[in-house]
């Protein structure tokens, strides 16, 4: 089994011209959203990488599959990354305007992965996992995602 990120893209404006400057590091806030905090057996977690400009002018931001990514971990162990098995450049430049979010939706197939897909993924067990959005410089807050029935986590 090869662990993959399955991408569902929200409409975003592609950069119409190269004269729009790239967003500065302090001009973008990255967050991670999900419609659920727990996913029953057989359901794939859905993550939204959400980028919002806080700058005063429109700017270009890379929302591509190799740039605006999600990483899932358990404790200190890295479990899965949305960019691990992405072929090609994975670049998609969008224009961000102040306060208007651009979102890229990503499904996790509940399997492990490693950068470059150097070994087959394995299904993960039910439990609590930490997820974070990352673009190489910016990181979101950590989100906890539960796999399995929520009652199974009670002592």
Regions inferred by a protein language model and the residue ranges of each:
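Primarily secretory-pathway and cell-envelope proteins
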Residues: 1-97, 134, 138-155
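Residue-level preference for beta-strand/loop junctions
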Residues: 43, 100, 125-127
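Intrinsically disordered, low-complexity Pro/Gly/Ser/Thr-rich segments with frequent PxxP/GP/PP motifs
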Residues: 85-115
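Short acidic/polar inter-strand loop motif in beta-rich domains
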Residues: 111-117, 137-141
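Short glycine/proline/serine/threonine-rich loop/turn segments at secondary-structure transition edges
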Residues: 113-127
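A short tyrosine-centered beta-strand micro-motif
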Residues: 127-133
């Amino acid at each position: 089994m090869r662990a993959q990120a399955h991408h569902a893209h929200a409409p975003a404006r592609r950069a119409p011209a190269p004269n729009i400057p790239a967003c500065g590091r302090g001009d973008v806030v990255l967050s991670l959203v999900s419609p659920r905090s727990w996913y029953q057996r057989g359901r794939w977690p859905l993550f939204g990488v959400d980028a919002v400009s806080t700058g005063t002018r429109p700017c270009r931001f890379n929302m591509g599959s190799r740039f605006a990514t999600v990483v899932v971990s358990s404790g200190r162990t890295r479990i899965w990354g949305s960019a691990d098995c992405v072929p090609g450049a994975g670049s998609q430049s969008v224009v961000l305007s102040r306060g208007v979010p651009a979102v890229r939706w990503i499904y996790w197939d509940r399997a492990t992965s490693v950068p470059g897909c150097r070994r087959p993924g394995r299904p993960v067990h039910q439990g609590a996992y930490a997820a974070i959005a990352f673009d190489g410089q910016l990181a979101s807050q950590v989100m906890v995602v539960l796999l399995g029935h929520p009652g199974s986590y009670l002592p």
